[in-house]
Regions:
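A structural signal for short hydrophobic beta-strand segments in well-ordered beta-sheet cores
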Residues: 25, 142-145, 196, 208
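Conserved beta-loop-beta/alpha segment of the NTase-like Rossmann-fold superfamily
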Residues: 61-62, 67-147
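Catalytic-core segments of class I nucleotidyltransferases/pyrophosphorylases
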Residues: 100-101, 108, 114-121, 135-137, ...
């Protein structure tokens, strides 16, 4: 089976995180979001991957190359001008000779793609749209289907009066190669606005599949922050690049945590992190690789990129800090996004408290000392050495 990943978006709603980075390359636990998508494909034995590119394409090509590091074969299709979500597939027709999956390189999901593909083939579908239940469907496409799952009607971004379901189109599709014949050459073309209406008009076998698991399109700064929190609680299954030493606790290698440090799960501490005397790491906090937290500093409900530094006595709450940000001593940050642009002020944005309520408390949340966490990490290392 083959896959096409759409990775040409600019990600304007994620500014300033996307000021120098294409949206699919924004970090999620020290890996680009796009890398998590590739890992998902590999878990489902999909090794032949084509990535469509536009904005800052060179960053993606330089990072992933031919895909050998991830055990997949990656090809690239560069769009000189915007081709819409479906327009770029026409160029790929010669290489797409079997059922293939289309997904977005800036969404996070753990859907069972094998189950969706089996459903697609069982129904002899030409196209299958994966659906997911959300609280507010107004920003997505909604679908009406018959009892057998065949799509009858599709409404993109419905008005409030048009909403009849909270199950939405995720932008993940299982397609047969024949569907490409509906896409014109070298023209912008969209799945929702153009292709799907044509399939309905021609009464093609176009089905939907209600997927189980997790999906988020990472369409806002608040959603970006909360995807991290969802991973810490296990709502989404990701391959995190650190050791899980206890429930809700991930710790990387070469970590220095002073015995007086207080840590409250769930949290993630990357490789080479250093936490100094009497500092604290509250619930739902992520420390990127090589971050430092000085004496008496406190962090909670925040995501810190690699190489960040939190000064003595500073407090960071509900914030996202890009790689390399240095917070001076005694500062207080709340619901802010900071990205290094080479200036002393950095690029800044406010981040809403959207979705924070579901992460305000955790069942069985314990406070750990730095000494206890260090012991857990050491024990796990010893067990792995014995197993080897």
């Amino acid at each position: 089976m083959q896959a096409v990943i759409l990775a040409g978006g600019k990600g304007t709603r994620l500014f300033p995180l996307t000021s120098r980075t294409p949206k699919p390359m924004v970090g999620l636990f020290n890996k680009p979001v796009l890398e998590h998508a590739i890992n998902l494909l590999k878990r489902h034995d999909i090794y032949d991957v084509t990535i469509t590119l536009a904005h800052r394409a060179e960053q993606i090509i330089d990072y992933f190359g031919g895909g050998s590091k991830w055990g997949v074969n990656i090809q690239y299709a560069l769009e000189d001008s915007p081709m819409g979500t479906a327009g770029g597939l026409r160029r790929l027709q010669p290489m797409l000779n079997d059922t293939f999956v289309v997904l977005s390189g800036d969404a996070v999901t753990d859907f069972d793609l094998k189950a969706a593909t089996e459903c697609h083939k069982k129904k002899s579908a030409i196209a299958t749209m994966l659906l997911y239940e959300v609280d507010n469907p107004s920003q997505f496409g909604i679908v009406e289907s018959d009892n057998g799952g065949k799509v009858k009607r599709f409404i993109e971004k419905p008005r409030q009066s048009e909403i009849f379901t909270n199950t939405i189109n995720t932008g993940i599709y299982i397609l047969d190669p024949e569907v490409i014949s509906y896409i014109p050459y070298e023209m912008p073309y969209d799945f929702s606005r153009n292709l799907f209406p044509r399939l309905l008009e021609n009464q093609e076998p176009f089905f939907c599949y209600r997927a189980e698991g997790y999906w988020c399109d990472v369409g806002s700064l608040a959603q970006y922050r909360n995807v991290h929190f969802d991973a810490l609680t296990g709502r989404v299954k990701l391959n995190l690049p650190a050791r899980r030493v206890a429930n809700g606790i991930w710790v990387g290698d070469d970590v220095e945590i002073h015995p007086t440090v207080k840590l409250k799960a769930p949290f993630y501490v990357g490789n080479g992190v250093r936490m100094s005397r009497n500092s604290s790491l509250g619930r739902f906090s992520v420390l990127g690789d090589a971050s430092t937290v000085e004496d008496d500093a406190a962090i909670t409900h925040s995501v810190l990129g690699a190489g960040t530094s939190i000064g003595r006595g500073s407090q960071v709450y509900g914030s996202v800090l890009g790689s390399g940000i240095k917070v001076p001593d005694g500062r207080h940050l709340s619901d802010e996004v900071l990205v290094d642009d080479g200036s002393s002020d950095h690029l800044r944005a406010e981040i809403s408290s959207e979705l924070m309520s579901r992460h305000s408390s955790v069942e069985h949340a314990f406070t750990w000392s730095g000494l206890e966490v260090a012991r857990l990490a050491a024990q796990l290392t010893s067990l792995r050495q014995l197993a080897a």
